[in-house]
């Protein structure tokens, strides 16, 4: 349920022009000093994830792993991608909160 809300919020952020979709645009956003958060799909390749995490660490930006695959993200946003940069502080904070709530729910379900 919370993941559907996250995908909906991503859709709103995309329509508002606050997302950089794809590896290269996300890396460019980090290099340009845009304070953001990076969301990655759970099926992103290890090599791509390593590169994104390295760049994010240098820019002091959080990387959050979503529970969705690239195909699921693509269905929600209209573009299949595994790396999303959220370039708006308000959207980024809300997505951080939603991702942490989802992680807490999953931990409770496992126990």
Residue ranges, per PLM feature:
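N-terminal first-folded block
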Residues: 2-40
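Amphipathic alpha-helical interface surfaces
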Residues: 6, 22, 26, 34, ...
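Signal for well-folded cores of large energy- and translation-related assemblies
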Residues: 11, 31, 57, 78, ...
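N-terminal positively charged helical leader segments and presequences
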Residues: 31-53, 60-62
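Ribosome-associated RNA-binding proteins
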Residues: 39, 110-111
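Short secondary-structure boundary segments
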Residues: 42, 67-68, 88
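Mid-chain, well-packed structural core segment of small domains
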Residues: 54-81
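C-terminal structural segments of small proteins and small subunits
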Residues: 71-110
């Amino acid at each position: 349920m919370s993941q559907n809300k996250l995908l909906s919020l991503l859709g709103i952020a995309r329509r508002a022009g606050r997302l950089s979709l794809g590896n290269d645009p996300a890396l460019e956003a980090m290099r340009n000093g845009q304070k953001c958060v990076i969301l990655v799909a759970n099926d992103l390749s290890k090599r791509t994830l390593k590169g994104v995490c390295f760049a994010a660490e240098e820019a002091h930006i959080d990387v959050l792993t979503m529970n969705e695959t690239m195909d699921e993200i693509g269905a929600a946003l209209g573009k299949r991608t595994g790396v999303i940069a959220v370039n708006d502080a308000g959207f980024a904070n809300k997505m951080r909160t939603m991702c942490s709530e989802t992680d807490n729910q999953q931990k409770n379900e496992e126990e």
